Amino acid sequence: MRKIRVVVIDDSAYSRRAITKMLESMPEVEVIGYATDGEEGIRKIIDLKPDLVTLDLEMPRMDGFTLLRIVMEYSPTAVIVISSRSEDEKVFRALELGAVDFVAKPTKGVSEEILTIREDLHRKVRGVIHLNLAGIVRREREQERASVAAGRRTSGSAPYAKAAVRTESTAPRPAGRLEVVAIGASTGGPPALQRILCALPGAFPQAVVVSQHMPAGFTRTFAERLNRLSPLEICEAADGDEVRAGRVLIAPGGHNMVFERQGSEVRARIVKPGTDDRYVPSVDAMLLSCAEVFGPRTLGVVLTGMGNDGSKGVAAINRAGGQTLAEAEETAVVFGMPKEAIATGVVDKIVSLDRMSREIIQRCGLLSDVD
């Protein structure tokens, strides 16, 4: 079996050693080169043609952002960002530029933390063999075009074009309308979520809940970033937060988000992951809870990601009479979670990322005309 060939790019000697040690503990991985800055990194990528690059963002001579732009344009390669929590805002910019995923940077002498980081890195490296690089490049170029277009509009507009929507006065909602849109994602999820949420109208008549596999400490910055870009109210969920129309709750990293109905209100409950939860925040835990609490008024959406998280949830939503969507293979960065959801046989529609927001809006009763 051919090994996964990796180049490690980091100006810190300690980080290079720690990352290399983590990688070389995987029998299917071979570290084939190192670089201490972006310029050297580009030369190594061109010469060695690795399957994967681990990348520090802050380096001398050429930073990780510049390297990402050049690599994605001329030599598309899978990139996992290695970042400290103090750089979490920069991580999401790197994901926009085409990085596949990120892991927290190891710190000296914290053995328990290093073990957790190693497990996270191993899982994401193994996902490289399922990677849709063409989809990443297509997504990155579409986002660049969208950003340029956004610059031509007024400063108050969202960075993605919205579908034409009807107002409540011209389109009365049916009695059995959806109450919640629940979206789950993993690898490749942050840019996909940004694209979808920024295309929804500010007066969105449903609540939106999101579980994105992400370490503790990063989800708050992710939510704050999306809140600045989207017309919706977006925040990291706290225990007891109300689930209400026009609001997006993002499950906090390292925890699961479930729901509890209290009279006419529904509240989020933030709970510790179960022993069977391989991925956290768990998409299945969120979707199963939605099926129980919201029943047929649930729209479940499974986006890009490794593994099968979400497949139990879509089955439960279907049994409860709700609706489900899955991202199409051609746009999914990793077609693992959507594939497993589709394999249940209960997904109502398979939708490419570029049409997902329109499909959600249509199913929520707002879209005036769909082709």
From Swiss-Prot:
Its main location: cytoplasm. It catalyses: [protein]-L-glutamate 5-O-methyl ester + H2O = L-glutamyl-[protein] + methanol + H(+); L-glutaminyl-[protein] + H2O = L-glutamyl-[protein] + NH4(+). Gene3D superfamilies: 3.40.50.2300, Methylesterase CheB, C-terminal domain. Residues 174-362 form the CheB-type methylesterase domain. Phosphorylated by CheA. Phosphorylation of the N-terminal regulatory domain activates the methylesterase activity. InterPro entries: CheB-like, CheB_C, CheY-like_superfamily, Sig_transdc_resp-reg_Me-estase, Sig_transdc_resp-reg_receiver. It comes from the Bacteria. The keyword Membrane does not apply. One of its GO terms (molecular function) is protein-glutamate methylesterase activity. GO terms for biological process: chemotaxis. It is an enzyme of class 3 (hydrolase). PROSITE patterns: CHEB, RESPONSE_REGULATORY. The modification 4-aspartylphosphate is found at residue 56. Its EC number is 3.1.1.61, 3.5.1.44. Belongs to the CheB family. Involved in chemotaxis. Part of a chemotaxis signal transduction system that modulates chemotaxis in response to various stimuli. Catalyzes the demethylation of specific methylglutamate residues introduced into the chemoreceptors (methyl-accepting chemotaxis proteins or MCP) by CheR. Also mediates the irreversible deamidation of specific glutamine residues to glutamic acid. Contains a C-terminal catalytic domain, and an N-terminal region which modulates catalytic activity. This is Protein-glutamate methylesterase/protein-glutamine glutaminase 3. It comes from Geobacter sulfurreducens (strain ATCC 51573 / DSM 12127 / PCA).
